[in-house]
Amino acid sequence: MASMGLQVMGIALAVLGWLGAILSCALPMWRVTAFIGSNIVTSQTIWEGLWMNCVVQSTGQMQCKVYDSLLALPQDLQAARALMVVSIILAALGVLLSVVGGKCTNCVEDESAKAKTMIVAGVVFLLAGLLVMVPASWTANNIIRDFYNPLVVSGQKREMGASLYVGWAASGLLLLGGALLCCNCPPRADKPYSAKYSAAARSAPASNYV
């Protein structure tokens, strides 16, 4: 059975990954202005997130606007919004399961049931980590593809924002924490040892009959 220290480390890493996923989802920095071509000298920077976009002036003033329509978002950001929300919900469920199945809690008395609950929590964290990695990698791939596409004007090219890096870090923490929790093996049932004796065959003394 995995030690309590390994279990606590797995839960801590998964919780950090969950918080990182929330931060990545909330920050409006999935795409940022690429300072190339005609954008080398500009007085403003554009941030694009899942829920809003922001314009940062050179003076430090920032104005943010929530998207008016979901259909106005690019396809990758629409998918990223859905996957990130599902990932955060799954990670929250994993945190709840890890608390229920923790060795230091008394929510479940049976040690075997506790270990199985922790394994389920680990699998949930692994799924949440994958759901964070997919939109972050997909968005990064589209940004890089458009950046090197000569048909895209420089004013529409973007660079990877901080939210993507936070998302990758959160995904790694969720995957690592989930893997550690999956190491919880249910204890084997201790069966009482029963000694079996076999009666020795007795040979009767030979009798001589007349």
UniProtKB/Swiss-Prot annotation:
Phosphorylated. Phosphorylation by EPHA2 is stimulated by EFNA1 and alters interaction with TJP1. Keywords: Cell junction, Cell membrane, Chloride, Chloride channel, Disulfide bond, Ion channel, Ion transport, Membrane, Phosphoprotein, Tight junction, Transmembrane, Transmembrane helix, Transport. It is found in: Cell junction, Tight junction; Cell membrane. It is a multi-pass membrane protein. Disulfide bonds join 54-64. Residues 209-210 are annotated as: Interactions with TJP1, TJP2 and TJP3. Pfam families: PMP22_Claudin. Residues 29-81, 139-160 are extracellular. It comes from the Eukaryota. One of its GO terms (molecular function) is structural molecule activity. The chain crosses the membrane at residues 8-28, 82-102, 118-138, 161-181. Residues 1-7, 103-117, 182-210 are cytoplasmic. GO terms for cellular component: bicellular tight junction; chloride channel complex; plasma membrane. Coiled coil: none annotated. InterPro entries: Claudin (IPR006187), Claudin4 (IPR003550), Claudin_CS (IPR017974), PMP22/EMP/MP20/Claudin (IPR004031). It catalyses: chloride(in) = chloride(out); bromide(in) = bromide(out); iodide(out) = iodide(in); fluoride(in) = fluoride(out). Residues 1-103 are annotated as: Interaction with EPHA2. The modification Phosphotyrosine is found at residue 209. The keyword Disulfide bond applies. Can form heteropolymeric strands with other claudins. Interacts with CLDN8. Interacts with CLDN1. Directly interacts with TJP1/ZO-1. Interacts with TJP2/ZO-2 and TJP3/ZO-3. Interacts with EPHA2; phosphorylates CLDN4 and may regulate tight junctions. PANTHER family: CLAUDIN (PTHR12002). Belongs to the claudin family. Can associate with other claudins to regulate tight junction structural and functional strand dynamics. May coassemble with CLDN8 into tight junction strands containing anion-selective channels that convey paracellular chloride permeability in renal collecting ducts. May integrate into CLDN3 strands to modulate localized tight junction barrier properties. May disrupt strand assembly of channel-forming CLDN2 and CLDN15 and inhibit cation conductance. Cannot form tight junction strands on its own. This is Claudin-4. It comes from Canis lupus familiaris. The gene is CLDN4.
